[in-house]
Every structure is written in structure tokens, then in C-alpha cells.
UniProtKB/Swiss-Prot annotation:
Gene this chain is encoded by: dapB
Entry EC number(s): 1.17.1.8
Active site per database record: H155, K159
Residues engaged in binding NADP(+): R35
Function: Catalyzes the conversion of 4-hydroxy-tetrahydrodipicolinate (HTPA) to tetrahydrodipicolinate.
Residues annotated as binding (S)-2,3,4,5-tetrahydrodipicolinate: H156, G165, T166
Protein name according to UniProt: 4-hydroxy-tetrahydrodipicolinate reductase
Length: 267
């Protein structure tokens, strides 16, 4: 039985992850974390998950929770995730990170901290999105240089980072398949008289509003035709179920940084 702890247990994703752990086989919820001072600290973690009492109180003691678990699932923010990763490394515990918005420097630090433990860092835990990553690479290689690439992503009005980590990863996948450096060809802003579109650029547009769970479309636009590859998330449950699947996988992995492509055997 894999013992799972959840960080951000009082949040939307935290609640869905706890529910996913309770419905999955071979795993159990052994800990729930929140920041010190959060009003739900001390309350049963099952209530936020819509389960009623499950006998696991929300704690603000990171060290104690990590020591008691086999793997920590973290959907918070980069700085919090890095702190959690540091503590997991201290105690030799695995961690699954679904936080987005990491800078290149933060990614490098995460890789350094993962030298002694297995770590999964994935901007999207959905099986469907990760299949899209595979498809996008294949399509980009087939179409080559004859099609322009644009990405549009839409999320709820409360999302804090832009563009989404999933959209950035899609851009990285396409750029890599085309032999381009994503950081050099990504275009996040067009306004006014900005000139013609350059051949290599990958445009990135964001939409924020309402309660959109998540929608990503990659356009391959040629002369006289275009291909659109879209993924739409209807609920957060596929993220939470994917994170539990990742947690079950990572506890048997060797030290290092992995993503959902590794979990799903898509490499």
C-alpha cells in the first residue's frame, strides 16, 4: 500500500486529489498539508474533498507529514514546491509536482534537488494532454517548415500564471520537433504595427474567464489549409487521477526527474 500525502489539501485540486486517492486501489491517504495559519488546519481533510470525515487532519507540519508518507503530491506554487522537494529529499521520499510557472532557474534547482530521490514534475497530469504532446511532436515533424504554429489556451479567471504550463510545454514539444529553441521563437505579445510574422515564431495567446477548467489548441496553419489539435478538460478529476497514477509509479523509480511521458510509457 502506497502512503500518499497531499500538499494544498484545502484547495480545489487538493480536494480532488484526496478524493482520487480514496477511490484508487493500492494507495491510501496518510497526510494532508496546508500553509501555517490556514483556517482549515486541524480540520478533517475529507470535508474539502466532499467525503465527510476520513480520519486525516490537515496539518501545517511539513516535516512530520513527509516523514510519514511514501510520496507527496504537490499542486501549489513553484517556491512552495521547491521547499517541499527539499524536505522530501532530506527524508528520502518521492514527490509528484503539478505546479506550473517554474522559471529556468527554478527548474535547474529542482533537478539538483532530485539527484537523490525520484521526482515527477509535469505541468499537466492528464492522460489525454500527454497523448497530445506525443501527437504534436509527430505532426510537427511530418509538416515540417511549411506550416505556421500558433497556440491558444483558455482557463478560469482565478488562474495566476500565464501562459499555462501545459501551453508552454506544447510549444516546447513543437519547437523541439522542428529543431528550434522555444525560448527564442516564442512570441507572447503582438500589438500595433509589429510587422509580418516571422517564419520560425510560435505564437502564444491566453484567454482568462469564468470557470473554464482548461482548453488548449495548437494550430498548424498552411497555405489553403490548417490543422487544429485541441484538448478540453471538463473537470479537474483527470488531473487528480493522473497524479495518483504518477504517485504509484514514482515510488518504484530510480533517482532523477521524470514527467508523465515516462509514467505513461510514451517515450
Amino acid at each position: 500500500m502506497v502512503k500518499i500525502a497531499v500538499c494544498g489539501a484545502a484547495g480545489r485540486m487538493g480536494g480532488r486529489i484526496i478524493a482520487a486517492v480514496k477511490e484508487a486501489e493500492g494507495v491510501e491517504i496518510c497526510g494532508a498539508l496546508e500553509r501555517p495559519g490556514h483556517p482549515m488546519v486541524g480540520q478533517d481533510a475529507g470535508y474539502n474533498a466532499g467525503l465527510g470525515a476520513i480520519g486525516v487532519a490537515i496539518s501545517d507540519d511539513l516535516n512530520a507529514v513527509v516523514q510519514a508518507c511514501d510520496v507527496l503530491i504537490d499542486f501549489t506554487a513553484p517556491k512552495v514546491s521547491l521547499k517541499n522537494l527539499e524536505v522530501c529529499a532530506l527524508y528520502g521520499k518521492s514527490i509528484v509536482i503539478g505546479s506550473t510557472g517554474f522559471t529556468p532557474e527554478e527548474r535547474a534547482l529542482a533537478a539538483e534537488l532530485a539527484r537523490d530521490i525520484p521526482v515527477i514534475i509535469a505541468p499537466n497530469m492528464s492522460v489525454g494532454v500527454n497523448v497530445c504532446f506525443k501527437v504534436l511532436a509527430d505532426v510537427a515533424k511530418i509538416l515540417g517548415e511549411d506550416f505556421d504554429v500558433e497556440i491558444v489556451e483558455s482557463h478560469h479567471r482565478l488562474k495566476k500564471d500565464s501562459p499555462s504550463g501545459t501551453a508552454v510545454r506544447m510549444g516546447e514539444v513543437v519547437a523541439g520537433a522542428l529543431g528550434r529553441d522555444y525560448n527564442k521563437v516564442a512570441n507572447y505579445h503582438r500589438e500595433g504595427i509589429c510587422g509580418e510574422r516571422t517564419h520560425d515564431e510560435i505564437g502564444m495567446q491566453t484567454v482568462r474567464g469564468g470557470d473554464i477548467v482548461g482548453e488548449h489548441t495548437v494550430y498548424f496553419i498552411g497555405m489553403g489549409e490548417r490543422i487544429e489539435i485541441t484538448h478540453r478538460a471538463h473537470t479537474r478529476d483527470m488531473f487528480s487521477r493522473g497524479s495518483v497514477r504518477a504517485a504509484k509509479w514514482v515510488v518504484t523509480a530510480k533517482q532523477g526527474v521524470y514527467d508523465m511521458q515516462d509514467v505513461l510509457g510514451l517515450r
